Design a protein with these regions (language model features):
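Membrane-embedded alpha-helical bundles of multi-pass transporters/translocases
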Residues: 1-168
Length: 168
């Protein structure tokens, strides 16, 4: 990136290529991990009942997309940092935390707190959506909010631009 900062476009084309490659690698990795959710949960939860294993797998499927969005947060954040734009990268996790806290408050308001003796038989898909989906939404927003300050920097896909290979 530093070498390409002297280019006429200040490294925008090189940055676009890196972002394309990074996005594709993170997307592929996330798809692989999601496809492996059931075997991973089976390996990590030895001795769990089939009901608990099923719930763990469903939660994993709701939460594993966070891998992609945390990766995008890091990738876009580093591009912003390299261009001296530190604020959004620093404050984006606050948005994630506010959404996560909101999801917990919503969950407690809709379903109440855990009580001794509660079991999985009473667990609903709505509880999963609010709890796991709410936290995943926070991570998605944490990444997506960084695209606002990124827009003015210039790294974006252009027709005719080859994302591969990345040459020095």
């Amino acid at each position: 990136r530093i070498k390409h900062a002297r280019d006429a476009d200040r490294g925008a084309d090189y940055t676009s290529r890196l972002m394309t490659l990074g996005t594709l690698v993170m997307l592929a990795g996330t798809v692989v991990v999601m496809l492996a959710a059931a075997p991973l949960m089976t390996a990590l939860t030895r001795g769990w009942s089939p009901e608990k294993l099923e719930m763990a797998t469903v939660f994993a499927l709701w939460c594993l997309p966070q891998v992609f969005f945390y990766g995008m947060y890091a990738l876009v954040g580093q591009v912003l940092n390299a261009n001296g734009r530190f604020g959004a990268y620093m404050w984006a996790p606050v948005l994630n935390n506010v959404v996560a806290i909101g999801a917990i408050v919503l969950y407690l308001g809709m379903f109440g707190a855990y009580r001794a003796g509660d079991d999985l038989a009473g667990w609903t898909s709505a509880q999963t959506v609010v709890l796991a989906g709410g936290h995943t939404l926070g991570v998605v927003l944490q990444a997506v909010i960084l695209f606002l300050p990124l827009r003015g920097l210039g790294p974006r896909g252009r027709e005719g631009s080859e994302p591969f290979p990345i040459s020095p």
